[in-house]
Amino acid sequence: MTIVRDSFYINGEWVKAVSPDTLDVTTSGTGELYATIPAGTVEEANAAVEAAAAAFTAWSNTSPKERGEFLMRISEKLAERSDELALVIANEVGMPLALSKGIQVGLPTMAFSENATRAAEFVWEEEVGNSTFVREPAGVVAAITPWNYPLYQISLKVAAALAAGCTVVLKPSEVAPINAFILADIINEVGLPKGVFNMVTGLGPVVGEALVAHPKTDMVSFTGSTRAGKRVMAIAAESVKRVSLELGGKSANIILEDADIPKAVADGMFKCYLNTGQTCSALTRMVVPRSRLSEVEDIAVATSAGFMPSDPITGSSLIGPLVSAVQQQRVRDYINKGIDEGARLICGGVTPPEGLEEGFYVQPTVFSGVRTDMTIAQEEIFGPVLSIIPYDTEEEAIAIANDSNY
């Protein structure tokens, strides 16, 4: 059965969307329709900011202890609904169910409980020499979040902002939004004051840009692509807003000559393939001694076989499908680019895993003999693709690691 959500959470209540336009959410494991959500408008984004601005004075004047109590109740409700949330995120994102419960739900639950504690313990005012430092909430925060760890990224932003005394307008990713609706249901259930938390779904160029541009938005916290982050910063600069950006990555994993190679390679590959490589801090560049390259390659091929994806709900693999058809094609294009530029494909490739032709699956893929000037060594792929780059000296290894736009 398709999940249908047709309202936004604004000023403490569910408000029916004005536009009939909707956005489809697909099941990553099958490609089938999973849910539909409303496509928000500029007017609805503005209404959410106005509600947050109206609620700010009262909320910022509540005691940190009281704010912490709200956060703790939210944490408890998330824990109560952990099975439901894990299933939702496994369907939306494709992370296997067991990992989804521990990571995609466990970490958000912890984020709210930890910020509840911090709110009560935080030093809001202190004397330093002849000066008094007073820490005050920033104001209305626009939180714009990605799809790869959807509820966790939401929770990190929302919990911290609420603990600080800020009010929030959330725009979750339209690719994986149902978990955000459940969080809004929980926030409504615990009785958070009206306007303190608001949520509008929709497209970034419409809802996201409206939130960033609104004169009553005081701060923007954005996690997503570098391209979108540049756009957020440019719009926010027009009104000199505070901006926090967490963008892309192409992290290097240097393995030294005297390392325990089997252990280091296996650990590095898990940190590359976690969440099917859809992690901004994934260790996607393995920089290894040239003298041990052949050994590393053999271990990488054998280890990759243990990461062959399976259905995120019923399977037992450590990885599942990619989030969408768009992401699947993007990863395939990068694999083809690696082949075209002369990297040596030692396992994986663009062919779907056997028996997983439906859904958005890609084989775990390893390239060796990769040079730093190759596209796959420079650009964020966001899929289960590892580049092995050999080095001759430790100085060269460091230079390789630093040869990145990130």
Predicted stretch roles:
Residues 1-91, 262, 339, 391:
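Short, structured beta/alpha segment
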Residues 31, 67, 89, 112, ...:
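Residue-level signal for inorganic ion chemistry
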Residues 49-50, 69-83, 95-122:
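Long amphipathic alpha-helix in the N-terminal Rossmann-like dinucleotide-binding domain
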Residues 219, 227-371, 393-395, 399-400:
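ALDH superfamily catalytic-core signature
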Residues 359-362, 379-385, 404-406:
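Conserved glycine-rich beta-strand-loop-beta hairpin in the small C-terminal domain of fold type I
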